[in-house]
Structures are given as structure tokens and as C-alpha cells.
Amino acid sequence: MLIALSVMLAVFAALMIFQQVHSRRQKAVGEIVAERLHVSDLEKYVDSEYSGRYVDAILCEELKSSMLDVYNRVCDVERRSRILMSYNPSIAKFKDDFENLHSIVNAHNNRFKDDKLREHKAFFDTVLAYPLDDQQRRSIVSEEQNCLVVSSAGSGKTSSIVGKVEYLIQKKHISPERILLISYTHKAAAELTERMPHPGLRGYTFHKLALDIISAQSKCKPSICDNTDAVFVRIYRELAHNADYRKCLVEYFADYSDLMELDEDEKSKNVRRLQLGESTDRRYCALFPDMDGNEVHVRSGEEKKICFLLTSLGVDFRYEEPYEHQVADERHVQYRPDFSIHYMDGGKPCRLYLEHFGVDEHGMVPTWFAKDRGLTYEEANERYNDGITWKREVHKKFGTRLIELSSADFAYEKARQRLKRELVAAGVPIREVRSDELFDRILPENSMREKVFIRLTATFATLLKTSCRSMADVAADVAQRGDKRSRFIVGKVLEPVVVRYNEILRSEGKVDFTDLIVGATALCNANGGGNYDCIIVDEFQDISMDRYNFLLALRRGNPQAQLYCVGDDWQSIYRFSGSDMNLFCHFDQYFGKTDLNKIETTYRFGNPLVEKSAAFIQRNPAQIRKNIHPFSSDAKTEIVFREYSRGDAVGVLERIVAEIPLGKSVLLLGRYTYDDYLLAKNFRQRRSGNSLFYTICGREVEFLTMHRSKGLEADYVVLLNCNNGSFGFPSTIADDPVLGFVMSDSDGYLFGEERRLFYVAMTRAKVRTIVMYDKSKPSVFVLECISPERLADKPIEPHPNAGNRWTRADDRKLYKLYCGGMGFREISQKMGRSQTAIIMRLEKLGLIDARKPVRKF
């Protein structure tokens, strides 16, 4: 009894002590909060302390820093005793509010915007000839340090810019001289200046602004090289006289130039992914004609190289010439060997056949063989190898001579050496062509191939500067990748051009346009940025790394200038000129905390085009999501697809133009400048400056490339030649992979930039967009728009035993079968596993070496 009483007294004493300690700590924490804030409700505090003010990122960080000590002390108390926190809800609320301070600030800023919209309603209703919409107004009243306005086609981004400038001048009382307007073209900059005739306010291009800064700060106006294309032609002509460089170019075109097109594996992956397939008979044009002077179109890059090797060895050949004996039957069409080699032996004409088999050192076909044919991998492998066996048996039956090359020869042995050895052994006379003669035949002066190559060198040198990289940076990346092709092209082909280009500019005392931006950036960083309160940038989706650095330098100051950037990532189509969509889509990562505003009402076109175009572009997950809608539910814009048969394109176009009411504007758009070839052949042409017009059905209509059409509109827009193929739309002509070292990263989506270009083209119309296509080869984009349900991926069925573990008994059986001379196909059938699994297991057991050729089966 006494013990129980003692325990109760001890517990009571402990509770009293705890209550006293709790009371003191609670009071201490309460005093801490009260001392610093006077209130523990941060939401009320922010609204009170910053009443009528926008809390930008800088103010928010200052506010957070001023409370950090209190927050840390509250956390310290919480770590010591969570019970104490539960007794004081205001302290717990303070901690929760502090951890969600950005949300509290965002809510405060939204209320600030609402207040400003009510206060300045009359201004926004009348500042332009028509009232600005709510999204435009909210972006204009934002006072965040970084404001990105994500616009849409026809959404009035220029109106937003004009409204922003007028708001800054009329309502914020900012001097026009302290507002910097930047656009990408002289025409756009001049238009902005004309629409806002305030003394001291002027629209600039990046280059004009950079020129003025350099001229003012250096007291010397730079001399600009405004015809760099001519400089690169001059450099090419100089280097082409160097024997070593000529030899490098021959090697480039012989071994590496075919990668400027999508390789077959990539092509098949792309087609499968879209489920809208391009035909698998896609061809590569060989560098040289055959023995009859005919252009040769082969089926793969390796066959293209074989054509080059045969020509360089002085061997006459024809491609896919019918076999000299009739062998067609119910299962086989007439046999056409890959190459028929013709030569004289003792005055007698002879023929040798050369087959190129697309198998690796294990006799296995590429995975895309199965994908393109809708087969399992085992079925594709078996079918292809059956074809090899049949061809060999045909030659054996008729006593004709066959030599073979395979993909393995290109991977593990110099194909030239192997081919030469086989030809000599067969008795074919070899007359090797000198390197100089090969060069002259590959790159005739003023040929299209020469022009394309010069354009590649110019693009690389230009992008090297716009990406703010050096040759040392690129060389380091190439070395890290360990890519033989890239090392050769960058080091042997492109670097001499870059070095010579910079030498010429220095020797002539000139700079190019990118040099202007880089130079002005350096001056701004050294001497302080411009004296601006706000920098406004139009067409921000076209921003490049050099311009990004220039903007950072321009806004340097205390305080730094506010940045208001307007653009549409859905219309980012200039990656080949250096634009980097990452700078737009991840704006806050480059500039800091950002107020992102979307303007999603289009005033140009209506449904169904609004819905269809938005669905089309947003299939790319890299694009910013938007809820695009027309300004009126009554606005209607159609998109129609008009097919034509080969030879009837002109007639269909005439009927389309004839159906368009008189007085309505019309634009003809092509993916390429030469998409007007049918127009030029069939209609009267007129040039006016850079504009090209054709008279069709008695009315004059303008032809533009889709790139040039950006920013324009017409009542009716006709998209020409929306067909499949290398020079179709989307184009499957890929940039040379080495440009990847100086270009911004792509968005990773199949034909991402081509998709954006198609979106730009289809959204130029106010009344109707008409898409013309050849019904025998429609563009994958056309098929997607007509039948979007066909986009569903069709997965390749795995082997039924895929994933089954290999047991010791399995390994013993495999060892026995393989060492007994059985081939991969037979082992696969015996063991119920795929041929790929058999080969991989043999490699793991050390029975075959993947790096060396093995016996064929």
C-alpha cells in the first residue's frame, strides 16, 4: 500500500514538472513566433505586409530568409517534444505555412492580379482596337522577375506584347527608354515599333542590338561578313586542292555519307511505332552509275558501299539484273542477283554474280527484318536463311559462279580487301581508279552533292558558335563517345573548315552575326548590363544558347530587369539554325522562378481544325499541354484531305482552286522549295522580290515553303505533296549525326520537329486547310490525321520460353548439340528456345566469341 502511494506521488510530481516545462517551452516558442511575426498566420501576414504588392521571387526569398531562424527553432522544439507542439496549434500552423510558403505567395499574387484586372478593366478594354482576353491581361499584370507567356497559333501574342508595353508606360509609369523590345526579324521589330510610337521605344533584332552595343562601347562599328555562304564555298575550293583533304572526302562519301539518311533499322522502328508504314523497298542512291551509265538505287547502305567499291576497283556491273536462266516457279519470282559483274576472259564475255546477305557473323538477320514483315524473329531468320540456301542451290544447279559478302564483312573486315580478294580469285581483272579521279567523279564542280556537302560544313561551323562550344569541346565529346565515324568526320573533314573560316574572318577584319552576339555578351558581362526595367522578347521558342547568354548579360543590374518572353513551343521549327526548345520548355531551370501564363484562345481559326491540330501536336509528350479553343463557338475551320493519282496532281489542284470563292486569299505551301516543280511546269510564274506567284484557274496565288509561312495566314491554305518518302513529309533525310555535337538535343519524339512544322502549316488557314497527297504513298501524318486509331503500338510477341532459366541439364544438352555440329536453327528447334537465346548462351559458356566470325549454318 505504501509502495503504491509512493508511485502515485512520484507520477503526480512528474506530471507537475512536465506541465511546468511544457508551459515554459510553449511560452518560449510562442514568444519566438510573436517576436518575429506578431502573428502566427503567415497567409494573413503576407497579405497584410505586402498589401497591394506583387511578391516576386526575390521578395519571397527575402521573406523566407527572415523567418528561417524562427522555423529552425520551432523544428528544434518539435524534435525534443512532439507533445508540446500539439498543445499549441498556432505554432504547428506556422511550421506548416512556412513549408508551404510558395503556395501562400502564389495565392497572394493571384489575388493581386485579380485586383489589378478590376482596377484597370477600362484600360484593357480600350488599349487596343478590341478588348484583350483574360489570359492576356493576367500575363500583362504579372510582376514576376521571369514571366513566360505560352501562346498558341493565332492567339494574339503580338497584342499581348503591345498591351504589356502600354501597361508599363501608362500604368506603371516606366520610361519607354527603359523598355527593351527584341524580336527575330527586322520586319517584326519594325512592326512593334510602328504599333507603339512612343519616343525612346524601339524594337530590335538580337543582331542589331548587339551591333549597337559593340559600336557604342568600343567606339568602332564592326565590319560584318554578310555573305558567309560564299566564304564556305571559297574554303571548300581551297581545301579541295589539298591531296590529303581530297582523300578524306573520298573516304567520307564512300564509308560514311549514307548515314545522312535514316538507317534501315531506325526507319523500321519509326514506321512500326507509327503503325503507318513506309514501304520496305526504300532505296539509297549509289555514288556512281552502273556500266550502262544508269543511276543505281540500292536497298541498303552496305549495298551502296559495294557499288562504290566495284567502281573504285574498275569493275563493270549491273544491279539486280535478271539471272541468265529462267528459274521462276510457283514459289519464286524470277531471280535477280544483287550484282551481276561483267568482264572479258580471253576475248569471251563472262559473268560473275555477287550477293550481299544481310546477316551477321552468326548468320542472324537484324531485328527489323521481323518487325517490317510482321513475323516473329525466328520466322524472319528462317525465311531469310532459306532464301540464301535457295540462291546458292540455283547457282550450283546451273553452274554459275557466285561470290558473297555479308553484313559481318562490313563489321569485322575491310570490305574492300575481302571483295578484291574474291574478285581476283574469280579471275575478274582489276583496274583500280586513282583517288583524284574518284574525287572528281564523286564531287563534280557545282553538283548537288557538292552543294549539300558545303552546306553541311557551313551548318556545323555556324552551330558550333550558336551553341557556344569550341572545337576542343566537340573533340572531347567525340573522344568520350569512342565513335570512329565521328572522330574521322570531325577531325579530318570539318575541323579544317572551321579553322580556315575563323582565319579568313580575322584576316579580313570581319565578324559574322553570331560573333556580334558573343561579343556584345562579353561587353555586357564586363561593363554591366543595359539600363532596363523590362526586357520583352517575341518568338521566344526560337531562342538559342548564344542569345540566352546575351539575355542574361543584358538584364544584369541592381535590380535586374524583368523578363517577359512570349512564344509557342508548338511552333518551334528552327533547330537546324540553333534554336533550343529546352530553353523554352524548361524556362525556370535556366532563368529561375517563373510565372508561366498560357494564352489559349485562337482568333484565327475554329473547330474542327482547332481540336484536330491540338490533338495532333500534343501526341508529342515533350510539348507543353494547352487547352486551345476558338474565340467563338460559331467559328468553323475545316481540314480536308484530297488524294490524287500519279499524274493527276495538277488536275486536282486546279479543281481545288476553282472551288475557292473569289475574293478569298489563298496560300500554297510546300515542305521544300522545289515542291513547286509541278506548278512551274504547268502554270505561269511571276516573281516579286522573294515572293513567288502562280496563275491557276485565272487567279494569282502565292507559293511559300512551310517554314516561311510561319506567322502568316490566309482564308484557304493548300498543303502540297504531303507524301511518304525520303523527300516527303515528314522528311526521312536525317541530319548528319555529327551535327548532334553542336545542335541542341532533340525532344526525342519521332519526327518531333517535322510534326511541329506540319502543325504550323495546317494552322495558317481561317476557313479551310486542304491537304493534298498521292494516294499510293500518303504521308504518315496524313494517315495519322485520317485514322488516329492506327497509332496504337503493335508489340512484338516474345518467344514463349523467353525468361526461362537455363539449368545445368540445359547447358549439357546445348554443349552436346553445338559440339556435334548442329546449327543454331536446329538447336533452337530441338531446345524450344529462340536462336538469339541459343547464341547468347553459347557466348556465356565461352563456346563462341561474339567479336569474331563463327561458322555459318
Residue ranges and their predicted role:
Residues 16-225, 763:
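P-loop NTPase Walker
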Residues 37-45, 49, 53, 178, ...:
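Conserved P-loop NTPase-based nucleic-acid remodeling module centered on helicase motor cores
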Residues 78, 95-153, 161, 202, ...:
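Conserved helicase NTPase motor core
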Residues 148, 158-161, 273, 282, ...:
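Helicase P-loop NTPase motor core
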Residues 336-386, 569-570, 819:
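Short beta-strand-loop-alpha-helix junction that forms the active-site gateway
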